[in-house]
Amino acid sequence: MEFKEKLLASHLAFEGSIDFSDSVHQTRLESLKTFEQKGFPSRKDEAWKYTSLNSMLRNDFALFPETETTIEIKKVKKYFLYEIDTYKVVFIDGVYSPFLSDTTHDGLDVCLISAALSKSKYRRFIDTYFNKIADTKDSLTSLNTSFTKEGAYIYIPKSVVAEKPIELIHFSTGKEKSLWLQPRNLIVVDKNAQVQILERHQSLKPHQVVTNSVTEIFAHQDSFLDYYKIQNDFSTASLIDNTSVSYTHLTLPTKRIV
């Protein structure tokens, strides 16, 4: 079975295993249809004319880890921001690790996107922001949307300054010979709010891992967001990253110099 067919075949069971709102279900099904029609990009696509995915797609990727993997904190502590207290959302082989994470709802939201997609109190934010600036015509973005489950949801309310930086960390352990990951992040920084975010992709040993990541960032008027991405993987790892940003830019009348 080709990898595309494996993805399509596994989606029905995956969709039935989660409890999201009807609108999210519909978005996911529409995105799956887009991926089914377009398939994986090839060199015929302008953005991929210098890159072929053919050899990578021959791997028999695991889509869902069979068991949850645990990691001793002493083995990965060096990958956290040194001597700085931070909020953390940590994933191990695509699965959320509550032991390594430090989330919050105290004045701001740093939590899982699965919680935001499934709980009614977040419905207004999801309807306003989820999948609104991601490229819905892109096949890999659509694939990510159709399988959205794990990832971070961050909301910094109006005029709030996050007291601590936020770390989003994805560890791949090598427990699976070949692994396909699809994290989805939704970040909203409201008017006059401030936050620093660091996203890290870290493989712990050489193995075939592909991360098809999608992040949507909304930075409202007079907000400040410092966002850093670190990919510290072995050469056997691949990161496909689609980050979309919506922000406010004002150009006021000025005197021309020339």
Predicted segments, located by residue:
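N-terminal amphipathic, basic helical "cap/leader" segment at the start of enzyme domains
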Residues: 1-142
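Generic hydrophobic alpha-helical segments
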Residues: 42, 224, 255-256
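Single conserved hydrophobic/aromatic residue that forms the stacking wall/gate
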Residues: 249-258
